[in-house]
Amino acid sequence: MKSSAIRQSFLDFFASKGHTVVPSSSLVPGNDPTLLFTNAGMVQFKDVFTGQDTRPYSRAVSSQRCVRAGGKHNDLENVGYTARHHTFFEMLGNFSFGDYFKQDAIKYAWEYLTTVLKLPSEKLWVTVYAEDDEAYDIWHNDVGVPKARIVRIGDNKGARYASDNFWAMGDTGPCGPCTEIFYDHGPDVAGGPPGSPDEDGDRYIEIWNNVFMQFNRDEAGTMHPLPKPSVDTGMGLERISAVMQHVHSNYEIDLFQALIAAAARETNTHDLGNNSLKVIADHIRACSFLIVDGVIPGNEGRGYVLRRIIRRAIRHGYKLGARAAFFHRIVPDLGIAMGEAYPELVKAQTRVMDILRQEEERFFETIEHGMGILESELKKLVAGGVFDGELAFKLHDTYGFPLDLTADICREAGVAVDTAAFDAAMARQKAQARGAGKFKLGAGLDYAGEATTFHGYDTLAREASVLALYKDGSAVGELKEGDSGVVVLDHTPFYAESGGQVGDRGTLQSKQGAFEVEDTLKIQAQVFGHHGVVKTGSLAVGDSVLARVDETARARTMRNHSVTHLMHKALREVLGEHVQQKGSLVDSEKTRFDFVQPSPMTAAQIREVEARVNAEILVNTPTQARVMGIEDAQKTGAMMLFGEKYGDEVRVLDIGSSRELCGGTHVARTGDIGLFKIVSESGVAAGVRRVEAITGDNALAYLQAREQEIQQAAAALKAHPAELGAKLAQTLDHVRALEKDLERLKSKLAASAGDELVAQAADINGVKVLAARLDGIDAKGLRETADKLRDKLKSCALVLGTVADGKVSLIAAVTPDVTAKIKAGELVNVVAAQVGGKGGGKPDLAMAGGTDPGALPAALASVEAWVQSRLS
């Protein structure tokens, strides 16, 4: 039975039992900022289990894409070396939200395994929590499992309710016992039943876990029965596929065999049992689906985990002999294997391949050098030795080797890595980076007062009272003239930095003094900190102030923020729906927008985006902002940022034909933007491009400056601006013709100089020796002259030098019959050392440079004596 058929049969079975089939959620959890990746089927239902969310159904079934790599659940180092460890896997699960409980959950599991999949019942073992008599009785009395195949598992992890068969979401909250189902591979495989001393063997393999959430644990550890007990189950598709296909390793199932064959094809490997092929086959799934779900290789967070997985795959390909990008070419094979179940993979195939290829090409530039350093160091160590942590950090910092990749290679050689030294080197680098960065006061301030009420959508000036003052991070009662600090107000028109938009600046004016606001940041979610300096007088807690935003800066920022929405929509229309925002910065000067895009934008695409945005501006439609519930916002079709966590209420912004969620400040009508111009487009990471654009008076000033430059260039070329291109092409043709004439003249000059120099050559033991300075000649001319002199002098050793821009250039040439005694590299370095330089090359030709032109005459004069010493 193929993996795809098992997946579908599971969904169909539970659908027939009244379950709603719920699609797999993203690998990037949208409702849990503490979780790096979705690692279980229940993640998308977590808020339902905790009562923070409701669904229109009480029974659900899903096949959830999961990743375990990085953080608490990290299987990376075992992948490829064991039968069942993966970075990516699919979790089949059925869920009850206060509907059915143990009785039906157990019966459903048994019916699916024995009736649908037709597994022999005598091959199945079960475990229950030692105190869960209810589950035990259901298994034995209702299902009919013999007592000999039901194992009670107690608290085996050193604490009350700390057991393999007791599940908890955390130290507090929903929890409960679980029952696990095991498959017996038979006596030919080593290992004992669950709960026995030999349970870690491979004979008895867990295939399904049913968690019964029936308690809520409080901070005192007391268990309170939940009013609506729930069920959360999980069965790995790869494990049950191995059972159904009568193989012992997950890597032997149909899905993996296709990917292993593809990896072997791309690395030209004939041994299909090689562990490196298993690594590559596993990693292509994790990497491809992470990119599909919006993760881009980077240097932190999820992006760095993705980069580590990609580079681990590349390293295993390198180990198999690959010396160029190969990994991305396996993506189409993955599409064939899994595209029917996950059509989003096929839809994004080109983008996935492009991002992987770029990441591969980048790492292949450094992997050979890095591997050379690593392998050289390993040769010095014996098994059981320790690899230098400082060197591991150098491999990480200079050659892009993640620590776990270095550790992986060392592990194969029986060597450990000094991770403490690595961590210390990393900490030093981070400390230096922090020291070089700009420090901003903000979230660290200790404030426990009332919240700030924001009025900045409607007004730019507002009376307010000072609630708190801070100086050097500590609360104070007063700020005096010249003091820098932070002011907290009860009301404010100042927008605090959020959503990529910078904080407002302006003034706080009281009877006692004036405070210049340089920036506005959130100290807490609803508490605004006004950062700045007292310009005159003083400011005290309790003072009444007039808070006034800098109107010009705010207007420019609003134009730039509003146009970002229009640009985002235009980018998706011109480049494709794969465009997703990866970051933004909006201030009074520009908007900077980072987005998913595998290749640079063409000039035509940039012009098209500009045209679409400016067309929206010309229509001059009104902007509308509405506050509504998150579900209502979703129904409107408003665009939401991928992976962003939103509250129950959100602000939906309609501007032009764009509709997005946004809490920033915006223009009243699109026409207020005035003018839009993209000023730069560049790459910031593999698969991520950056556009910078300007609006309004800034855009006008930019275009006027470019126009002035064109007029000045036209005047210099004595041409009309409209004819500048043709005139420039004509001028360049003329320059190229002159350059060719110059090259011919230089060659003649070099030949003439060569003829004169032949007569200056000294004869030492039958070898012509020449050392001379040539002026007005470049490096190319120097070499041509040396070649001609060598031909004319026959048996010779010569050095020529020239000076340009305060730098010395040298060349040494030696005929083949002389290289046994005189090497050109040695000869040129004798001279170079005297002029403050060094060089190198072949035995018959070498070049060098120097920094001391004044020493050149004496250095050249020393050549004859040195040659004499080598020939005598």
Swiss-Prot record:
<dbReference type="InterPro" id="IPR023033">
    <property type="entry name" value="Ala_tRNA_ligase_euk/bac"/>
</dbReference>
<dbReference type="GO" id="GO:0006419">
    <property type="term" value="P:alanyl-tRNA aminoacylation"/>
</dbReference>
<dbReference type="GO" id="GO:0004813">
    <property type="term" value="F:alanine-tRNA ligase activity"/>
</dbReference>
<comment type="function">
    <text>Catalyzes the attachment of alanine to tRNA(Ala) in a two-step reaction: alanine is first activated by ATP to form Ala-AMP and then transferred to the acceptor end of tRNA(Ala). Also edits incorrectly charged Ser-tRNA(Ala) and Gly-tRNA(Ala) via its editing domain.</text>
</comment>
<keyword id="KW-0436">Ligase</keyword>
<feature type="binding site">
    <location>
        <position position="662"/>
    </location>
    <ligand>
        <name>Zn(2+)</name>
    </ligand>
</feature>
<dbReference type="GO" id="GO:0005829">
    <property type="term" value="C:cytosol"/>
</dbReference>
<dbReference type="GO" id="GO:0008270">
    <property type="term" value="F:zinc ion binding"/>
</dbReference>
<dbReference type="InterPro" id="IPR018162">
    <property type="entry name" value="Ala-tRNA-ligase_IIc_anticod-bd"/>
</dbReference>
<dbReference type="Pfam" id="PF01411">
    <property type="entry name" value="tRNA-synt_2c"/>
</dbReference>
<keyword id="KW-0547">Nucleotide-binding</keyword>
<keyword id="KW-0648">Protein biosynthesis</keyword>
<dbReference type="InterPro" id="IPR018165">
    <property type="entry name" value="Ala-tRNA-synth_IIc_core"/>
</dbReference>
<keyword id="KW-0820">tRNA-binding</keyword>
<feature type="binding site">
    <location>
        <position position="666"/>
    </location>
    <ligand>
        <name>Zn(2+)</name>
    </ligand>
</feature>
<dbReference type="Pfam" id="PF07973">
    <property type="entry name" value="tRNA_SAD"/>
</dbReference>
<keyword id="KW-0694">RNA-binding</keyword>
<dbReference type="InterPro" id="IPR045864">
    <property type="entry name" value="aa-tRNA-synth_II/BPL/LPL"/>
</dbReference>
<dbReference type="InterPro" id="IPR018164">
    <property type="entry name" value="Ala-tRNA-synth_IIc_N"/>
</dbReference>
<feature type="binding site">
    <location>
        <position position="561"/>
    </location>
    <ligand>
        <name>Zn(2+)</name>
    </ligand>
</feature>
<dbReference type="GO" id="GO:0000049">
    <property type="term" value="F:tRNA binding"/>
</dbReference>
<keyword id="KW-0067">ATP-binding</keyword>
<dbReference type="InterPro" id="IPR009000">
    <property type="entry name" value="Transl_B-barrel_sf"/>
</dbReference>
<dbReference type="InterPro" id="IPR002318">
    <property type="entry name" value="Ala-tRNA-lgiase_IIc"/>
</dbReference>
<protein>
    <recommendedName>
        <fullName>Alanine--tRNA ligase</fullName>
        <ecNumber>6.1.1.7</ecNumber>
    </recommendedName>
</protein>
<dbReference type="GO" id="GO:0045892">
    <property type="term" value="P:negative regulation of DNA-templated transcription"/>
</dbReference>
<dbReference type="Pfam" id="PF02272">
    <property type="entry name" value="DHHA1"/>
</dbReference>
<dbReference type="GO" id="GO:0002161">
    <property type="term" value="F:aminoacyl-tRNA deacylase activity"/>
</dbReference>
<keyword id="KW-0963">Cytoplasm</keyword>
<dbReference type="InterPro" id="IPR012947">
    <property type="entry name" value="tRNA_SAD"/>
</dbReference>
<dbReference type="InterPro" id="IPR050058">
    <property type="entry name" value="Ala-tRNA_ligase"/>
</dbReference>
<keyword id="KW-0479">Metal-binding</keyword>
<feature type="binding site">
    <location>
        <position position="565"/>
    </location>
    <ligand>
        <name>Zn(2+)</name>
    </ligand>
</feature>
<dbReference type="GO" id="GO:0005524">
    <property type="term" value="F:ATP binding"/>
</dbReference>
<keyword id="KW-0862">Zinc</keyword>
<dbReference type="InterPro" id="IPR018163">
    <property type="entry name" value="Thr/Ala-tRNA-synth_IIc_edit"/>
</dbReference>
<keyword id="KW-0030">Aminoacyl-tRNA synthetase</keyword>
<comment type="similarity">
    <text>Belongs to the class-II aminoacyl-tRNA synthetase family.</text>
</comment>
<dbReference type="InterPro" id="IPR003156">
    <property type="entry name" value="DHHA1_dom"/>
</dbReference>
